[in-house]
Amino acid sequence: CAKEGINVWNLIQLANRHPRVNILQPGAGVGGHCIAVDPWFIVARDPGNAQLIRTAREVNNHKTVWAIDQIKIAVADASARTGCKPKVACLGLAFKPDIDDLRESPALHIAAALNAQGYDVVAVEPNIKSHEQFELASLEEALESADVFAVLVKHRQFLAPLAKQKLVELKALDFCGITA
């Protein structure tokens, strides 16, 4: 959709008006200890009959790579505008909204990959108190200190009207439909 200039969130909302359609909300990838892992057991056991499962998992895994690439483009643009090294706020680390579980989290993978590649990352995860790899910031702190914003998880806190308005104003990269 992005390549064609189509707003995926509007497209999903429109399609879901049909009574027999229920398109799920895409995100920065698929995580958790079940859906992200268990299909690979089926693929390993019967690869010939699990081609669709393999393809689905590969497509979902690539979504995380695509999100990282989009963030890198935004960082390069911000750097070109300011001449400084931009700080990236990764909003959400959990594998799904409003939980403290980071197992197989695509959001955590994105933040960690950016950090490992030398990007200045500030992490916001309202459902945990600390993380071994990141110093956590509040949403307010991140909104004040960062230059590029990536909404990776649709946490309730990020949906608050003032937060949502600020993310729209800051032209946040929205990988989960908060600003749509």
Which stretches of residues belong to each language-model region?
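Structural/interface elements that position substrates and couple domains in central-metabolism enzymes
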Residues: 1-180
